[in-house]
Amino acid sequence: MDTGGNSLASGPDGVKRKVCYFYDPEVGNYYYGQGHPMKPHRIRMTHALLAHYGLLQHMQVLKPFPARDRDLCRFHADDYVSFLRSITPETQQDQIRQLKRFNVGEDCPVFDGLYSFCQTYAGGSVGGSVKLNHGLCDIAINWAGGLHHAKKCEASGFCYVNDIVLAILELLKQHERVLYVDIDIHHGDGVEEAFYATDRVMTVSFHKFGDYFPGTGHIQDIGYGSGKYYSLNVPLDDGIDDESYHLLFKPIMGKVMEIFRPGAVVLQCGADSLSGDRLGCFNLSIKGHAECVKFMRSFNVPLLLLGGGGYTIRNVARCWCYETGVALGVEVEDKMPEHEYYEYFGPDYTLHVAPSNMENKNSRQMLEEIRNDLLHNLSKLQHAPSVPFQERPPDTETPEVDEDQEDGDKRWDPDSDMDVDDDRKPIPSRVKREAVEPDTKDKDGLKGIMERGKGCEVEVDESGSTKVTGVNPVGVEEASVKMEEEGTNKGGAEQAFPPKT
């Protein structure tokens, strides 16, 4: 395989990309609890595939700097962050009122190392934004991120801290406009809610709509005030396949890119929209899912790739490995190399899994109506919004560890985490693990449909600074330390937004 340093030739556009990949070896150790479908171990499985396919050698591999309290409080309420920092399995019985207040308990359980987990995945997403802002990479990847349901004042849908909102706020320091695209099967409600009233962030969510968590994302939810028409929702039904999905995705996203002209794109790649997902009901193949990544990559705009949902974890690892290859411009072989988790992928031991023969309930007429309605809404946006020339806010401090000095294929330690999947027996470890559980499907999506949080918004001013409004509003503390990169300050914290051309 011919490399180009950290940058490989892409597909049809022929343009090279430099890719930064954020990974913390300890992220797979966190454990939501017995029977819970969210398994951070899937991130370690993904990393193992990347190592054995040789993809780590073609990226800059970085260990994220943990997000600090003040970083998280750029969006989240300070008392909520304080609660996450202090709560433990041993003390939770003494904080019943707080657990209810912040919606922590069942879907979002308290577990050992909860706050460190939040700091880790949020740090990777914010770190990716900083790298993109400084032009140090073209694509940044954090598969541990993408937890799109978390609200300002509460946890929701397995998500505690909304790393996506934090990453977008960081990107807004450099870019006038940021586009958020969500291909998770669940509506990206937390991100939409945060930016519902601003025209500097456009949110586009392709999701299952109906009696399904979180119950939001109607096609008529289009934004409010200056954000009107800057929220796009694409409601889909069970069984949508690759062809049907891209009848909507490509024309809609093509028009969005033409009209909105974002300076950066954040793509949440939730893998629960794949065929056969434990909590999902779509019928996308891995190649069909990855086609969305390939399409957004083709616009040559700084791109942040994040994870998200995905509960048949062997397929999650397959998907994100393949999509890492797409980001690099490498066609990853279907035949899987032998590695620590090889037995999980039997009996075929291949990267790709055939879609099922489930019924596609999305008729051609329905898809055309959705496409026409959304294109009509986009036609009401005459031009991309701009902001006045302003001083650029300082960068968030992200002194991540560059691991490129080591052999990329040997960076992962298979002994530091449990070898457990939906259908595997646990191996003893320093982290308590659950027993084997069946790979059953939950037709309602996530366990326990919860009422959507109301009244919390992020107001973004022209400089990229933010103010959170709603329940228990708090002041926003900006990070004040400039990022030092290889002994020099690249990009300069004093840079201002360029004037609109």
UniProtKB/Swiss-Prot annotation:
Binds 1 zinc ion per subunit. The modification Phosphoserine is found at S416. It comes from the Eukaryota. GO terms for biological process: chromatin organization; defense response to bacterium; DNA-mediated transformation; jasmonic acid and ethylene-dependent systemic resistance; negative regulation of DNA-templated transcription; negative regulation of response to salt stress; positive regulation of stem cell population maintenance; regulation of multicellular organismal development. Residues 17-329 are annotated as: Histone deacetylase. Residues 397-407 have a biased composition (Acidic residues). It is an enzyme of class 3 (hydrolase). Zn(2+) binds at D184, H186, D272. Its EC number is 3.5.1.98. It holds the Pfam family Hist_deacetyl. It is found in: Nucleus. The keyword Zinc applies. Highly expressed in leaves, stems, flowers and young siliques. Residues 383-501 are annotated as: Disordered. The keyword Phosphoprotein applies. GO terms for cellular component: histone deacetylase complex; nucleus. Residues 422-457, 479-488 have a biased composition (Basic and acidic residues). One of its GO terms (molecular function) is histone deacetylase activity, hydrolytic mechanism. It catalyses: N(6)-acetyl-L-lysyl-[histone] + H2O = L-lysyl-[histone] + acetate. The record marks Y311 as: Polarizes the scissile carbonyl of the substrate. Loss-of-function mutant (antisense inhibition) has an increased level of tetraacetylated histone H4 and shows late flowering, developmental pleiotropy and increased symptoms when infected by a pathogen. Belongs to the histone deacetylase family. HD type 1 subfamily. PANTHER family: HISTONE DEACETYLASE 19, HISTONE DEACETYLASE HDAC1-RELATED. This is Histone deacetylase 19.
